[in-house]
Design a protein with these regions (language model features):
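Mobile-element integrase/transposase regions
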Residues: 13-84, 92-93, 104-110, 191
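Short, flexible loop/turn elements at secondary-structure junctions
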Residues: 15, 59-62, 86-90, 98-102, ...
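C-terminal, beta-rich DNA-binding module of retroviral/retroelements integrases
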Residues: 45-47, 52, 62, 230-292
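Active-site beta-loop-alpha junctions of metal-dependent nucleic acid enzymes
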Residues: 97-133
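Acidic/histidine-rich, metal-coordinating catalytic segments
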Residues: 123-151
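RNase H-like two-metal-ion nuclease catalytic core shared by retroviral integrases
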Residues: 143-146, 153-163, 167-212
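A conserved mid-domain beta-alpha-beta active-site/ligand-binding segment of alpha/beta enzyme cores
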Residues: 212, 216-237, 241
């Protein structure tokens, strides 16, 4: 057995190669961005980044489904854009925009939704909402996003200056810095894909040769799809069990909606209370040039 025991130098080499690599060597070999994304030390979960509600992670994706016009269901209108705002401390999906617009207009609509009355928003789509299931209301005090054009544009900059909102723009290719909103996007789309197969949902073979033309399967309108997204958000807010809240007391709730209420009841909130009409008046809008 003694001849099978590695020498100290061999053990040390194995340990540093497989368990404790030299950061400088890894950076030289893979680059700083790859090291920060995949190999840097982690000292906690994303939800430990903030102790109070009011810091929102914001992102956008294109829905994996084709939609039709509500005026003429034989006409395909394309794929919707989905914007989400997720509270960092509670994991609650605080705001959403679903539509064909993209860019700053859609982003402002998502932030306005996060600040507004969710019961009225849901009622517009025929959904009866209990306020406890989607309790978020108010502007965030901090916004975390990537460096997309809509997140770095003049309109969001004016809004942040107007209300004193802090803004953090992440470096390129660093989606892991806002994991809550990235995961929420996947959860929402994965929740309905299996139920809507054959109804315009895009499969994994999209773009491949001889792949199905999913546009021909589209049957849902934008309003119908939006209602599905809203139902999914409500279910995630009130029923999803959070697993990364070990930093909180044992009596803390483990679902986003209940954790939001628990934090706000303790005064741990940095939300900015604004009136919906005031926000509409003060929110920056698009500009247009008059032409002949």
């Amino acid at each position: 057995m003694a001849d099978q025991i590695p020498s100290w130098s061999s053990f040390r080499l194995y340990y540093f190669r497989h368990f404790k690599g030299d950061p400088q060597k890894e950076i030289a070999r893979e680059g700083l961005t790859a090291y920060q994304r995949n190999n840097r030390p982690l000292y906690g979960s994303a939800m430990q980044y903030r102790e109070s509600v009011g810091c929102y992670q914001v992102d956008e994706t294109q829905g994996d489904i084709y939609l039709v016009s509500k005026w003429d269901r034989s006409k395909v209108i394309g794929r919707p854009n989905v914007y989400l705002a997720i509270d960092t401390a509670s994991g609650l999906i605080a705001g959403v925009y679903v539509g064909l617009d993209a860019g700053e207009t859609a982003l402002m609509a998502c932030i306005a939704n996060a600040a507004g009355d969710k019961a009225a928003y849901c009622a517009a789509y025929g959904i009866d909402l209990s306020p406890a299931d989607w309790p978020s209301r108010g502007l965030p005090s901090e916004i975390i996003s990537d460096r997309g054009g809509e997140f770095m544009g003049d309109r969001i900059n004016e809004l942040c200056i107007c209300y004193g909102i802090d803004r953090q723009a992440l470096p390129p290719f660093r989606a892991e810095e806002k994991p809550l909103v990235e995961r929420a996007m996947d959860l929402i789309q994965d929740s309905y894909k299996s139920m809507l197969r054959g109804r315009g949902v895009i499969g994994d073979d999209v773009g491949e040769r001889w792949a199905t033309d999913y546009r021909q399967q589209a049957i849902l309108t934008l309003d119908e799809y939006t209602a599905i997204v809203i139902h999914t958000i409500i279910a995630l807010n009130k029923g999803r069990v959070l697993t990364d809240i070990g930093h909180l007391p044992v009596d803390a709730p483990n679902t986003p909606a209940q954790l939001w209420k628990w934090l706000t009841d303790q005064g741990k909130s940095t939300l900015l209370d604004v009136d919906a009409d005031e926000l509409y008046r003060r929110a920056p809008g698009d500009s247009a040039d008059r032409s002949t």
